[in-house]
Regions:
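Bacterial signal peptide processing site
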Residues: 61-63
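Edge beta-strands of extracellular beta-sandwich domains
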Residues: 152-157
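Short, low-complexity, Pro/Ser/Thr/Gly-rich segments in the mature regions of secreted, periplasmic
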Residues: 238-255
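Short, surface-exposed binding/anchoring microloops in extracellular/periplasmic proteins
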Residues: 68-96
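Compositionally biased low-complexity segments at domain edges in trafficked proteins
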Residues: 167-236
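Tryptophan-paired
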Residues: 97-148
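Bacterial N-terminal signal peptides that target proteins for export
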Residues: 37-48
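C-terminal motif of bacterial Sec signal peptides marking the signal peptidase cleavage site
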Residues: 56-59
Length: 255
């Protein structure tokens, strides 16, 4: 059986370790006395069809079901990852619990985009990875490695209703990139990560400005990077960023 959370994310079910159960094959049944070989074959075919029908009904009733495609004014919304310049991070996972209560695991991760300055934040960001087949976010779980410290952090961020309202509200705007009017949506959630476990979250759109959702304090992941799977080893820090930290240190308190 697949749990409701796994049903919301077929990729998670694929991580299960499926194995065939070995069994002893029984000997073929003897043909009853007085019954022709053709009668036996016909009877066995009917029995096989009945078994297949039962198996099909069982699979339909108990197998994983894909959630319906959410009704949004766009094909997908986006998650962007950001960090201050030289404050290198590695995102282990971004998980989403959408407003339907369906969980989607590892929808994003890896490297982040870096702002133009080390201290303070930029105005949000643009771009990101499309989050397909997922409804508007109710919660976002983030776990990452702050490589300049180094330290592993995790946080569960509650997304307020006003953010979801903004994400589906159309707005006419002159897009500065194309210099023409268009109807745009705030379909991007940007996650900014800084040393000390600081997280800033914005909502915005490609042709619209970004609005801050909030500033949050993450907690240290007690098991370390990769929840202990790497035995305390972090992703290596880029030499350029290491040289900057060695010379200037980490400007805690500026984010």
């Amino acid at each position: 059986m697949v749990s409701p959370m796994e049903a919301g994310n077929p990729a998670m079910a694929a991580h299960k370790d499926f194995r065939f159960n070995s069994r002893v094959v029984p000997p073929s049944p003897r043909r009853p006395h007085g019954q022709s070989e053709a009668d036996c074959v016909s009877r066995m075919k009917r029995l096989a069809c009945a078994v297949l029908m039962l198996c099909s009904l069982s699979a339909c009733g108990g197998g994983p079901r894909l959630p319906p495609t959410p009704k949004l004014p766009y094909s997908a919304w986006y998650i962007g990852l950001a960090a201050p310049k030289h404050m290198e991070v590695w995102v282990e996972t971004v998980d989403v619990l959408d407003k339907r209560g369906l969980a989607f695991y590892r929808v994003h991760g890896g490297v982040a985009s870096y702002t133009g300055k080390t201290e303070g934040w930029h105005g949000g960001g643009s771009g990101g990875k499309p989050i397909n087949h997922v409804d508007l976010p109710g919660q976002i779980f983030l776990r990452w490695q702050s490589l300049v410290e180094p330290q592993a952090y995790k946080i569960n961020i509650q997304i307020p209703q006003w953010v979801r309202d903004e994400m589906v509200r159309p707005e006419r705007v002159i897009c500065k990139f194309k210099q023409r009017w268009k109807t745009d949506y705030r379909d991007i959630i940007a996650l900014g990560m800084a040393p000390g476990g600081i997280v800033k979250v914005w909502v915005g759109g490609g042709c619209l400005g970004f609005t801050e959702i909030g500033r949050f304090q993450a907690e240290v992941e007690p098991r370390g990077p990769y929840r202990g799977a790497s035995k305390g080893k972090y992703v290596p820090l880029e030499p350029e960023n290491k040289a900057y930290i060695d010379q200037h240190g980490i400007p805690y308190g500026s984010w």
